[in-house]
């Protein structure tokens, strides 16, 4: 299960959408897909300045998946059909958030000799193949290049999964504006918090799920690394062990704060995770009741 509160307009920006006009004017339909659930959120757009988007519906449909699967369970597609059928042809801005379980992330170092689009595509594919040789998937790769000399942040999603999603949504005349892994939304929300609270662009951005963490290191606006690691109920201990090792290898990262969604923090505080500083990222819209445990985020 992905654990965080949705933050429309912050974790998914208009600029990220392939359907920017719907993102500006239509209500949002958010589909959060994990191995064990399909969560469906509907948000009414706020038209007046200072008003917040209103959540008008939330449903959770249990799925029989495994945390080891590289694709969602087959039961997802019938469940998705049942959810979308009553909405067919209606005007929505559709946002699909996928568990990090189905994504692969990689921070590739700057290579001055890699210039053409063909060279970049080959470099990205080679990097992913080297890092994830055993997955055996046909991946759709998205790259977020940094500025000169900075790393390129890659994410890859199974092409078969994206194709089935497109077909399912097209069948109900609900074209997607955004399809993204959950960590992307976590990063967007953390970056927004950095700007609002006057933090520099430095920190560990953590996306927590029931069975694993996705952890990325940002220093001076450069995504230096990103990795996924399995966890259980003792996830805070696992995270602290990881960061302690990083302190030894990279002492300059010792003082970086940890950015966690308030829903994900699970009681993690600077006091309970000493010597690390924890920044609880809260929804800018005030969304987030304890009963909601959800997945989302974004990247600059």
Regions found by a protein language model. Give the residues of each.
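Hydrophobic/aromatic-enriched cytosolic interaction surfaces used to assemble or bind macromolecules
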Residues: 1-300
């Amino acid at each position: 299960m992905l654990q965080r509160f949705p933050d429309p307009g912050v974790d998914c920006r208009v600029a990220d959408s392939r359907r920017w006009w719907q993102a500006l004017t239509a209500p949002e339909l958010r589909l959060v897909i994990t191995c064990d659930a399909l969560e469906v959120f509907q948000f009414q757009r706020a038209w007046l300045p200072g008003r917040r988007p209103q959540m008008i519906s939330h449903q959770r449909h249990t799925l029989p998946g495994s945390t080891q699967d590289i694709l969602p369970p087959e039961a997802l597609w019938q469940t998705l059909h049942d959810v979308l059928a009553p909405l067919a042809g209606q005007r929505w801005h559709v946002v699909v958030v996928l568990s990090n379980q189905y994504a692969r992330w990689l921070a590739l170092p700057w290579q001055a000799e890699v210039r053409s689009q063909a060279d970049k595509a080959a470099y990205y594919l080679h990097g992913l193949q080297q890092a994830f040789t055993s997955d055996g998937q046909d991946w759709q790769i998205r790259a977020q290049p940094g500025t000169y000399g900075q790393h390129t942040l890659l994410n890859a999603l199974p092409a078969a999964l994206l194709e089935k999603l497109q077909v399912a949504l097209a069948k109900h005349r609900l074209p997607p504006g955004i399809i993204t892994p959950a960590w992307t939304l976590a990063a967007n929300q953390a970056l927004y918090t950095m700007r609002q609270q006057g933090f520099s662009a430095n920190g560990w951005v953590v996306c927590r799920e029931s069975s694993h963490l996705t952890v990325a290191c940002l220093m001076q606006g450069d995504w230096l690394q990103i990795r996924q690691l399995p966890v259980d109920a003792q996830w805070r201990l696992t995270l602290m062990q990881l960061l302690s090792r990083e302190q030894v290898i990279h002492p300059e990262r010792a003082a970086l704060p940890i950015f966690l969604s308030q829903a994900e923090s699970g009681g993690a505080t600077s006091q309970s995770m000493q010597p690390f500083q924890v920044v609880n990222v809260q929804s800018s819209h005030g969304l987030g009741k304890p009963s909601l445990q959800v997945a989302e985020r974004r990247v600059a």
